[in-house]
A protein has these predicted regions:
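C-terminal regulatory/effector modules of DNA-binding transcriptional regulators
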Residues: 63, 71-74, 98
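Short, contiguous alpha-helical
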Residues: 1-42, 78-142
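Short amphipathic alpha-helical segments with heptad-repeat character
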Residues: 53, 57, 64, 94-97
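Proteins with a high burden of low-complexity, intrinsically disordered sequence enriched in S/T/G/P/A and R
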Residues: 1-5, 51, 71
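A short, structured beta-strand-centered segment in the mid-to-C-terminal lobe
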Residues: 44-59
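Helix N-cap and loop-to-helix transition residues
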Residues: 8, 47-48, 71, 88
Length: 142
């Protein structure tokens, strides 16, 4: 289990990919982001590292298709259909980006605790301009 969270490592990896997938559901399938969307867990058949990695690669592939197509020049000022308030698609995309980034920071910290050197870890510049939380975990000491 993860420190500070009742979540397994695989669930964290899935969650990172699913955050971006929820954005794509909004943009590609016109689905509203409902409360609980970020609480999804991997389906039972997604029970190996390889399957979670394949899901992440599929999300990345679909995001690139969106970005290079309709996402290349979308109307980012239009209202996003999300549970957490009156925001634009630009704000939703920004939140999606830093939300994924925050969990990547958590995963990197877990790897560090386990003595595993991550491949291409994010740097401060990776998140420049984003409203990233100061702490990696909400309940971290100062």
């Amino acid at each position: 289990m993860l420190p500070h969270r009742p979540r397994a490592y695989a669930q964290l990896a899935y969650h990172i990919f699913n955050i971006a997938d929820a954005f794509l559901e909004h943009e590609v399938r016109s689905l509203r982001l409902d409360e609980g969307a970020y609480d999804r867990v991997p389906p039972p058949e997604m029970n190996t590292k390889a399957k979670i990695i394949a899901y992440g690669q599929d999300v990345l592939r679909r995001f690139r298709l969106w970005w290079d197509g309709p996402g290349h020049a979308p109307n980012l000022s239009r209202k996003a259909l999300v549970y957490y308030g009156n925001v634009t698609v630009h704000e939703f995309l920004e939140r999606t980006t830093w939300h994924c980034g925050q969990h990547v920071r958590q995963l990197v910290m877990v790897l560090d605790i386990m003595g595993i050197e991550p491949d291409r870890p994010p740097s401060e510049e990776t998140f420049a301009g984003l409203p990233m939380p100061d702490k990696v975990w909400d309940d971290e000491g100062s």
